[in-house]
């Protein structure tokens, strides 16, 4: 059996794909897997460590891009059809990103079994383009308006849940993270809180993203703050923290909940269909997180939410422990690999 896996653009798409590849290999070592991502994803350590049999990188873009870029999308589509034929691939699964939409379309044109996994609470564009012809749609959140769906959660949740048993949570450790691209607003909030001496009771770590590292480092170099551009062990960083401040990407949220970590979530408004807000709202409504919308972000609002979180921490811990998704990942893997 030969499987092709598509994911790219952000770690939110890539991390669940890599985790599923790992689990497939652990269960069915004879399954041959090709992982396809975009050229821009080449430097991610998680891809370098991926245990697929082959890894391919292709240049592709949003279908809303220029004519020149869409010509490259057509080229990627044609290359993927050739690859699927030459390798005699039997099944394909996409985890989102432009490469996923193009790849699943190519697989469908060749009458392969196809599947998609949606990490967010609102279906992404790439998945929307192909969902009518896929054999099954695997969901992280219970989105009820689509047929042929199975709610399996985000694969990183179960990894995080297992990890929390082995990592000691450091009291008073506060972690600021802001997604693959980094966040000016979250980094600025962290800087203002530290320079204003509002977090003197906390051991603060900031993962800034490449774009903001130098600026944050210069502003805080004379403090005890730990500042990193990127982390290859983010899930361990989350698990060891008492409080995490984060964007509302699906993988980050499921890692936070899975490791039973207190959090203040600041959804990015600059995403398709405002899906981060809806991701965060889902967990807010079940009592697992505190949330601040970016328009309401201020030091006073943050400190107010932090006080609520700390003063009621046992209630949040209980809600996170009570949050349960049936682990249907094994069922998903069996269906893909039939």
Q: Which residue stretches match the model-derived regions?
A:
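Active-site-proximal region of nucleotide-activated glycan assembly enzymes
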Residues: 2, 32, 108-163
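Conserved nucleotide-sugar phosphate-binding/catalytic loop shared by glycosyltransferases and other
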Residues: 5-11, 26-72, 178, 292-295
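Donor-nucleotide binding loops and adjacent catalytic segments primarily
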Residues: 35-36, 41-51, 161-243, 277-280, ...
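An amphipathic, basic-hydrophobic alpha-helix
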Residues: 64-91, 109
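Acidic donor-binding loop of glycosyltransferase active sites
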Residues: 89-90, 239-254, 261-262
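C-terminal "capping" alpha-helix adjacent to the active site of nucleotide-linked donor transferases
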Residues: 286-314
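C-terminal alpha-helical cap of glycosyltransferases
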Residues: 308, 325-338
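A short, well-ordered alpha-helix in the C-terminal region of glycosyltransferases
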Residues: 314-326
